Amino acid sequence: MVYSSTSSSQNRPDGEKHVEAVGSSTRIPSDELVDRGGGDTTTGKQSPRDIHGWKWATAYSAMLSTTLLFALDNTIVANIQPAIINDFGHLELLSWIGTGFALGTMFILLWGKVYGVFNIKWVYIFNIFLFEAGSALCGAAPNMAALIIGRVIAGVGGSGMYSGTLTYVSVLSNDQEKPAYLAGSTVVWGIGSVLGPVVGGAFAASSATWRWGFYVNLPIGAAFAPVYFLLFPSFDPYPSKTLAEKLRLVDWINAVIFLAGSACLTVVLTFGGVVYPFNSGTVIALWTVTGILLVAFIVLLKLHPLVAKENRLYPLHFFKQPTLINMQLQVFLSSGIILAMTYYVPLYFQFIKGDGALEAGVRLLPLIMFMVVASMVNGFLMPRYGLIPIWYIGGSSLALIGTALMYTVDDSTSNANIYGYNILIGAGTGSYIVAGFAIVQSLVPVHEIANAVGAMTIFQDLGMVLFLAISGSLFHNVAVDKVGKALPDVSHTEIANLIAGSSSKAFQALSDTEKALVIPEIASAMTTIWAFFLAAAALSVVCSFPLLKAKIGGMEKRTAITAA
């Protein structure tokens, strides 16, 4: 995630204030002059908000609470998946517990456009309601299908809350205040990401059960509800426009096509070879529909008869800028590696080392903490000293070394070694995982900054969704094959249930002799996941070297704060 204080003043004949909010970037008029070249300037000294003192502190705290919940929900299921499978079964849907939430966050591109058109307060509150409703459905879910639907809804609302927080902070603070307030969001996001697996593991191991990993969002949301309604300022970017006029400013058709295509791609990657054979009619049909929707999306970006060019979801001419595309690929790869690691490192410790859910969650701390710290150090140093290629080459190289070492992990590898490998991956990816959000702002004109950052955000989400889906499919297919060979007398269904987690009934029912046969095969199956991450890190290294010749300047002229 990235937060930038760059702003732009735009005069409008109708006297409306223009707000561009895309994913994690919002632009508003302010009064501190910053020269970007080409005559574009920004300004900002006076605080633009009407609330101050305890009211503003309370409102800001409420915004941070939504960031905490969103970050917590992003990683909380990493350690409660085995308990969920124990209750519901359907191992083939295991990856959807995480993928469903990540898929819902794909709405962040649409929410960014919506916040730039409609009243921020009510869009924000609507997203809080969506998130809480999704959490309630997850907690009360009677089956796996209901849980996955709840996760998708929570992801949709959570991405809207996150986008809303950044929009509000950008609208309600000037350029001097903005870095400090956004740094607060950085810290809270890091805390939530670290606590997620630990909190989830604690609930899974207690009498409260895994359901409270989702219910916990409800009392926190209820406690801050009065603040949302009474203290959050009402801010309408286009007060003189009618609802119909506002609706025409959003590219709804292409948004639906994009989301449908993302869903089809995720389904085929998750279910291919797990639920349906790779050569089945269902898988072939899903790939076909995905391709058709992709073509339709690109065509409408170029030739949309109902939406003005500046209001389309993605500027097609960005594909003509190699460095900008490089930044999008880098955030896709690094974000995918980190999120998938938070799911499979605990699974390794539970299966191979016999950890409980809580203990396995704690084992993630080296990975997450070093990622957060490295990201914050990058956000502090890169805008001041530049050296952009070094951050990318150095960071991706560390990630490559870490993933290569993870590829050597087996059932006898010491915990200390795994911690060290995780530190390399965390520090490496953290060095550049969100650096591109600030860099792209030096590659485009002021009026396209929001679009550039929005494109980065959607590639970040795509990386998380697709890496979870691919990792889940790889693990399931390889583990079923290897464990099946180790236990030839056990049925395919029982083996599928067995690899759901060390707390699964099927695994617990094994004798010590059988467990001794299965555990090395599980560790071996996980090497396919580490190999996938290794390939992604290697691609990241390769893509980093062209940055040595890329013209990326002016970073020191803009205030940018990056956060994981």
UniProtKB/Swiss-Prot annotation:
Belongs to the major facilitator superfamily. TCR/Tet family. Residues 1-48 are annotated as: Disordered. One of its GO terms (molecular function) is transmembrane transporter activity. The keyword Membrane applies. Signal peptide: none annotated. Efflux pump; part of the gene cluster that mediates the biosynthesis of depudecin, a highly oxidized eleven-carbon linear polyketide that acts as a histone deacetylase (HDAC) inhibitor and makes a small contribution to pathogenesis. Is presumed either to be responsible for exporting depudecin, to provide self-protection, or both. Induction: Expression is positively regulated by the depudecin biosynthesis cluster-specific transcription activator DEP6. Residues 1-12 have a biased composition (Polar residues). It is a multi-pass membrane protein. Its main location: membrane. Gene3D superfamilies: MFS general substrate transporter like domains. GO terms for cellular component: plasma membrane. This is Efflux pump DEP3. The lineage of its organism: Eukaryota, Fungi, Dikarya, Ascomycota, Pezizomycotina. It comes from the Eukaryota. It is found in: Cell membrane. It holds the Pfam family MFS_1. The chain crosses the membrane at residues 65-85, 91-111, 122-142, 152-172, 185-205, 212-232, 255-275, 281-301, 332-352, 362-382, 386-406, 423-443, 452-472, 528-548. Residues 29-38 have a biased composition (Basic and acidic residues). InterPro entries: MFS, MFS_dom, MFS_trans_sf. Keywords: Cell membrane, Membrane, Transmembrane, Transmembrane helix, Transport.
